[in-house]
Amino acid sequence: MRDETPEQPAPLRFGYTTGSCASATSLAAARLLLTGVASDTVDIVLPKGQHVAMRLAFCRATDDGGAEAGTIKDAGDDPDVTHGALVFARVRLVHEPGVRFRAGPGVGTVTRAGLPIAVGEPAINPVPRRMMTEHLAALAAEHGYAGGFDVAIGVENGEALARKTMNPRLGIVGGLSILGTTGIVRPFSCSAYIASIHQGIDVARANGVTHIAACTGNASEDAVRARYGLPDIALIEMGDFAGAVLKYLRRASVARLTLCGGFGKLSKLAAGHLDLHSRHSSIDLPLLAEWAGEAGASAVLQHEIRAANTSQQALALALAHHVPLGDVVCAHARRVARDIVPGEVDVETLAIDREGRIVGVAP
């Protein structure tokens, strides 16, 4: 009997950003107004020069003399909150040249300073705005049109979807943001999450926040909120991306930073890992045993910690013997952070257990 050959996994599919969807639908609607031709697909050029054809769900005239077009957002194999959502554009021709952007249903409006879009503007980021403007300008030139375009971008159920994003905390109300820098969604890319971390820091700074807390999850946010009473705008949901916070503070510093996370996550940071996800870093139990020794653990206890199954078991062993392992881990984590952020930033680290109790502090 021959050995079975495992199937090779299919390559992950790329998708398209909401910015690409907005560009395609606004172009299709505008073309209908200028030519009378309703398209099934529309070709657009992405920021790096790639040409793509996007399929439309509809392209039709509206009762107010305008036109609208929609497309189903395909994020490829990326677990994107907007995957499968209907992104649409409603376009009207206006006398004044240029493009005026409006937030349609399901697209948010900026209410706080610190984002790349001014307060009061629809949450359509700079690159999607540029993409739409360039495509519409080329269309106008092609058909000798000297007027402008009123463009409203919407996302079906966008207001509900936005509650699953960081938009409410960033001060974007009423819906989603239209995003994208390359026009392409890369499967399981971290870039969008890291960008939201940076935006959170920018918004906090622009609104006068001097103490921010970067947290790995909801439990650590609750612990920081209970300890300091910080407002939501000061809480940065960093997840596993500690490095994204620390490195960004080199160019956008604050007076005070609190880093808070589960004991296991903080032990990874203490060991020098800046990506705390299990795919990229692991718990170093021998190192935890060594640190327990720094905190006064006996040789026997160090051996037990080294043989523990999890970081939580190691912590429980230490606490049962009144060894402040959490404080030592936090001190090492603070040292790692201190080596990255500017000297003027006051850094503190907090570790919590699975019940959300603070088990380590390094002020």
UniProtKB/Swiss-Prot annotation:
Instruction: State if Glycoprotein is listed as a keyword.
Output: no
Pathway field: Cofactor biosynthesis; adenosylcobalamin biosynthesis; cob(II)yrinate a,c-diamide from sirohydrochlorin (anaerobic route): step 6/10
Record-annotated membrane-spanning stretches: none
Q: Reaction(s) catalyzed by this protein?
A: Co-precorrin-5B + S-adenosyl-L-methionine = Co-precorrin-6A + S-adenosyl-L-homocysteine
Q: Does the keyword Mitochondrion apply?
A: no
One Pfam family this sequence matches? CbiD
A Gene Ontology biological process term: methylation
Q: What is its EC number?
A: 2.1.1.195
EC top class, in one word? transferase
Source taxon at top rank? Bacteria
The entry's family comment says: Belongs to the CbiD family.
Q: Please report the name of this protein according to its UniProt entry.
A: Cobalt-precorrin-5B C(1)-methyltransferase
